[in-house]
Amino acid sequence: MQRALPGARQHLGAILSSASVVVKALCAAVLFLYLLSFAVDTGCLAVTPGYLFPPNFWIWTLATHGLMEQHVWDVAISLATVVVAGRLLEPLWGALELLIFFSVVNVSVGLLGAFAYLLTYMASFNLVYLFTVRIHGALGFLGGVLVALKQTMGDCVVLRVPQVRVSVVPMLLLGLLLLLRLATLLQSPALASYGFGLISSWVYLRFYQRHSRGRGDMADHFAFATFFPEILQPVVGLLANLVHGLLVKVKICQKTVKRYDVGAPSSITISLPGTDPQDAERRRQLALKALNERLKRVEDQSVWPSMDDDEEEAGAKVDSPMPSDKAPTLPGKGAVPESSLITFEAAPPTL
């Protein structure tokens, strides 16, 4: 263990040296708050449901709870999550969008978690759910990063034996955390943070994230039902469509709007908000193929003579006199050969 620490420290330093300011700031905040926990009580930085809502309004905890850790292994998970997000997501989104994503996920996890425990208190009247539960840590952001990786590189293989793709990792980890919770090896706020991180990040990436093609990602491979096994996807898809229709009616979500753009004079580009570039390229190739087939059929038809040309040729043959093989003969005289000279008879003298 002591031999591995210097190598890991050196590797982490090399990664952070090439990271952006956002990644460095988040990692520094995690380390600072962890070291601060040895000197003072940092419980006021975690989301406590009874203190977040009125009359206390500990609003700042929505910004700090995702950075607060109390164990060294939790610090390692937080740093690894931030570094992975910086290496894989920041080149696609940019540093500002990564910071926005981090803020949206953590604020949503804090609000949804506090509201869930408030409902639990209203059902059980147990004050533990209001003033003892503390929501903190990077598991919520970890769930958001895994959802974003499913969106961007879902077909990548994480394990070869057994074969595990990135697209199934979010639900696999959720199942693992659920088993740990049932075995009392994990506290309920950690499981709640991860679950709400999955939901909030998917909603943001699906409907609200801004990019060059519009807003959100309505691709089929990123539908909510794709997070579940194939046998459950039809049922989950039906329920998700019902919920989405309800949210559209109350104007929380917007309808899927198709946008048609003429990309070039030689082709037509049909783009949907959040469409995968590979899908757009495939549609473009199909459109070009269909256009080439139509042009080929038109060229083949132009080779055959038209009916109008046939009728004109037939009419010309009818109007023109048929040449005779023999010249007309006068009775009692021999045949006179044809002559191309034209003779004129002398006109009578005028008076």
From Swiss-Prot:
SMART domains: DUF1751 (SM01160). Residues 300-351 are annotated as: Disordered. GO terms for biological process: retrograde vesicle-mediated transport, Golgi to endoplasmic reticulum. The modification Phosphothreonine is found at residue 329. Residues 206-229 are annotated as: Mediates localization to the Golgi. One of its GO terms (molecular function) is identical protein binding. Residues 1-19, 119-126, 187-351 are cytoplasmic. The chain crosses the membrane at residues 20-40, 98-118, 127-147, 166-186. GO terms for cellular component: Golgi apparatus; Golgi cisterna membrane. InterPro entries: Rhomboid-like_sf, TMEM115/Pdh1/Rbl19. Residues 1-205 are annotated as: Mediates homooligomerization. May play a role in retrograde transport of proteins from the Golgi to the endoplasmic reticulum. May indirectly play a role in protein glycosylation in the Golgi. PANTHER family: PLACENTAL PROTEIN 6, TRANSMEMBRANE PROTEIN 115. Belongs to the TMEM115 family. Homooligomer. Interacts with COPB1. May interact with LMAN1. Interacts with the COG complex; probably through COG3. This is Transmembrane protein 115. It comes from Bos taurus (Bovine). The lineage of its organism: Eukaryota, Metazoa, Chordata, Craniata, Vertebrata. The gene is TMEM115.
